[in-house]
């Protein structure tokens, strides 16, 4: 028999908070539709690609009447991409809402991600199974995967298996790529005359699936709290031993939301924000200068220790390196067959050097061989460089160390520099969800079903007013096409949901920018400690600093 921890046992008893409108009978909740919407960019291209689902109105859930809510339904659900804390509660909320509307309705889960609907691997959810996963971390209830449904054969197979199960709707829980898939499936089903609704759920710990209506993706709250605890622990170790500089790489390939939130929570000496690097056209050398400046100033005060936060995707945001990666992605997509026949790593490097254009060839040649090799490792499923394999923090340590050595020889630096590197990634993906994520995810699952009960398809579930107590939350449905634009993938233009980057004019970054100079020279660390689930509201129910600052509550 599997043992469960006392905390897990206690969390089974936690009852997630719902906004008032979702506490009503499902038949008394209606979707109030607004005006037609437009995509964020590339509107004509997207109108052609989504001829049946483009331009839908925003749906706001309000009290009203929905006579169709109680009919018997079969709904499928898929967990897609990397795990994020709270995924199980989305499924629990979806299950509870569906059963509240009609006990005879059925929820089935496709196993292992989108491949589950293609291979027809599935389970039916029961009360006893659902109850084992309430308020727990992970995606293990059905597993996840990164398969993309993109070929005509895959779309046809997904439809065939959906019809086989008599699906009325399919809910896809995932990030920007997964929700792009949801939009494409919704369009395909309508095109084929199949009355199968598709609803997306915004998931990603990176925090880059957000906009005016999606205030946060689920998992971001928990993940940043886990990382902030670890950073705080390391900062406390730094001021205890007083001899190490800790370089910490954090998740966030496409945006620096995690690094920024963790900086606001812990006050490191240096935090690099990738978006600022790109905006200021900074070189790798200038980033090194910024870190060296902090090291030298702190050494002058006798403080040969510190904490540096580095976003996982930094290297792509350095314009000169970003241009290189863009060309590499295109080159290796076009010439994959030839490249894959070369086994020796050094021969691969030499072959690539010969294919790159002028400045990109120069930048590639200037990087240490270890970084060159990492840039040429296996692509991710979308054909891009696997940025998490690039150990940027080690590159920075090497370059900072070299610069300090030169300064010491000039007599401009008299301190000691001993660096340790860390990468925080998997540690947070399956953590017990914070109270915020437990509540938010349960409400998202509930919202998804109410959107289904109102006959909507091609929408993503959303909740507004997240920085305030759940009693003030407002559930909505946002048209997926509204968030899309065209981007180059595998060397071709494809419709995708636009990633949200750190807004350099936004309140979170501005707060950070006003304080970072003081943090660089002082040891002003804050120690958040572990996530708390019980106790006063200011200890266990606080949203992220990012949310509070964005909504003017901090």
UniProtKB/Swiss-Prot annotation:
Record InterPro entries: ATP_PFK, PfpB_PPi_PFK, Phosphofructokinase_dom, PKF_sf
Keywords, sorted A to Z: Cytoplasm, Glycolysis, Kinase, Magnesium, Metal-binding, Transferase
Site (Important for catalytic activity and substrate specificity): 177
One Pfam family of this chain: PFK
Cofactor(s) required for function per UniProt: Mg(2+)
Any GO molecular function: ATP binding
Enzyme class, first EC level, given as a word: transferase
Highest taxon above the source species: Bacteria
A biological process from GO: response to glucose
GO cellular component: cytosol
Active site: 206 (proton acceptor)
Binding site for diphosphate: 82
Record: residues binding substrate: 204-206, 243-244, 251-253, 312, 426-429
Function noted in UniProt: Catalyzes the phosphorylation of D-fructose 6-phosphate, the first committing step of glycolysis. Uses inorganic phosphate (PPi) as phosphoryl donor instead of ATP like common ATP-dependent phosphofructokinases (ATP-PFKs), which renders the reaction reversible, and can thus function both in glycolysis and gluconeogenesis. Consistently, PPi-PFK can replace the enzymes of both the forward (ATP-PFK) and reverse (fructose-bisphosphatase (FBPase)) reactions.
Family listed: Belongs to the phosphofructokinase type A (PFKA) family. PPi-dependent PFK group II subfamily. Clade 'Long' sub-subfamily.
Protein name listed in UniProt: Pyrophosphate--fructose 6-phosphate 1-phosphotransferase
Species of provenance: Spirochaeta thermophila (strain ATCC 49972 / DSM 6192 / RI 19.B1)
């Amino acid at each position: 028999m599997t043992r469960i921890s006392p905390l897990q046992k206690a969390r089974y008893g936690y009852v997630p908070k719902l906004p008032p409108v979702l506490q009503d009978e499902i038949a008394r909740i209606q979707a109030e539709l607004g005006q037609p919407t437009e995509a964020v960019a590339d509107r004509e291209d997207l109108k052609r690609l989504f001829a049946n689902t483009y331009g839908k109105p925003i749906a706001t859930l309000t009290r009203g009447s929905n006579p169709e809510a109680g009919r018997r339904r079969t709904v499928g659900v898929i967990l897609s991409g990397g795990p994020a804390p709270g995924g199980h509660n989305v499924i629990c909320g979806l299950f509870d809402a569906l059963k509240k509307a009609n006990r005879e309705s059925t929820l089935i889960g496709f196993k292992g991600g989108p491949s589950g609907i293609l291979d027809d691997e599935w389970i039916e959810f029961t009360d006893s199974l659902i109850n084992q996963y309430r308020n727990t971390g992970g995606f293990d209830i059905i597993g996840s995967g990164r398969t993309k449904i993109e070929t005509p054969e895959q779309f046809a197979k997904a439809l065939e298996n959906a019809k086989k199960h008599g699906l009325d709707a399919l809910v896809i829980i995932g990030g920007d790529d997964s929700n792009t898939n949801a939009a494409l499936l919704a369009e395909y089903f309508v095109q084929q005359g199949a009355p199968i609704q598709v609803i997306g759920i915004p998931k990603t710990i990176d925090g880059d699936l957000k906009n005016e209506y999606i205030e946060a993706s689920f998992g971001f709250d928990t993940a940043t709290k886990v990382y902030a605890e670890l950073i705080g622990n390391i900062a406390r170790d730094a001021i205890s031993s007083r001899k190490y500089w800790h370089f910490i790489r954090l998740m966030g390939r496409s945006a620096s939301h995690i690094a920024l939130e963790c900086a606001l929570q812990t006050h490191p000496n240096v935090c690099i924000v990738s978006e600022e690097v790109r905006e200021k056209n900074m070189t790798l050398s200038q980033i090194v200068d910024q870190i060296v400046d902090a090291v030298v100033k702190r050494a002058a005060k006798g403080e040969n220790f510190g904490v540096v936060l580095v976003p996982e995707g930094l290297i792509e945001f350095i314009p000169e390196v970003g241009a290189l990666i863009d060309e590499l992605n295109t080159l290796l997509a076009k010439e994959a067959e030839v490249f894959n026949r070369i086994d020796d790593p050094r021969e691969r490097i030499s072959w690539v050097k010969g294919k790159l254009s002028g400045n990109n060839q120069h930048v590639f040649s200037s990087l240490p061989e270890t970084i060159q090799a990492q840039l040429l490792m296996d692509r991710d499923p979308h054909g891009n460089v696997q940025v998490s394999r690039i150990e940027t923090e080690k590159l920075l340590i090497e370059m900072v160390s070299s610069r300090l050595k030169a300064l010491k020889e000039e007599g401009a630096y008299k301190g000691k520099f001993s660096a340790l590197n860390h990468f925080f990634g998997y540690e947070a993906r399956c953590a017990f969800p914070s109270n915020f994520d437990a509540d938010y995810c349960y409400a998202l699952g509930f919202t998804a079903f109410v959107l289904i009960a109102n006959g909507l398809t091609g929408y993503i579930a959303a909740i507004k007013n997240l920085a305030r107590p759940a009693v003030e939350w407002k559930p909505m449905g946002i048209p997926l096409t509204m968030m899309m634009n065209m981007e180059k993938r595998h060397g071709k233009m494809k419709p995708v949901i636009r990633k949200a980057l750190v807004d350099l004019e936004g309140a979170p970054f501005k707060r950070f920018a006003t304080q970072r100079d003081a943090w660089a020279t002082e040891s002003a660390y804050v120690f958040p400690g572990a996530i708390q689930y019980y106790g006063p509201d200011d200890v266990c129910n606080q949203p992220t600093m990012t949310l509070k600052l964005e909504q003017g509550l901090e």
